[in-house]
Amino acid sequence: MTPRLAATVLVVRDDPFEVLMMERNARMLFASALVFPGGTVDGADFSEHWLPLVDGASGLEQEERALRIAAARETFEEAGILLAESSAFAPDIPRSMRFIDVVRNAGVRLGLGGLHKIGHWIAPEVAARRFDTHFYVAGVSADTIPVCDGGESVALEWIAPARALELAEAGSRNIIFPTRMNLKRLAESHSVAEALEAARRPVYTVLPVIEATRDGHIVRIPAEAGYGTTCDRPHPDVTR
């Protein structure tokens, strides 16, 4: 099965350093999991009509441009935050409107240059649903107020990366393996500036492998991926 191209965004702010996470709807894939805003790339994200409406697209391949547009679109649709070229803000514009019209009506240009890739994960070949997901980090001002869409997400919260990892380890929050690994990497930073600087490192494409053992299935990733962890239990939604 060919994986679907997808983008997700680690939206971060200072004072204190936190990342925006959302709780998935209990009726959807990865039910009630704590995730970053994100989703699959649409055909409209590839449109040439975007060219006069984006900033920072010079030198980007068409697919990379579409990925960043999708990342910005999902951030707006799920959290109400528009990642514009000058600053991120929450425009009073219906989220049901086509995203390209949202940007036009807001009178801004999307800040594609403010989206920095920090991860690339492709779902295991045996996964029931496969996504080719590109992870980005984007900084916003400390007073940015996200607004839950009430559809795919039922709650939004700012949380310190290390705290999110603690909750996952304690079993009080459901956070899937790729999300935890990117939280772990983000927790190495202590400010938006540090997180953006860390995003300058080369990105390793991770293709996890699911193995059967006497104690059940495990998912493995290469040590070269640099996450400091090489195995975990796969989420049930990955294998069913």
Give names to the regions the model predicted.
Residues 1-240:
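N-terminal leader/linker segments that precede catalytic domains of diphosphate-processing enzymes
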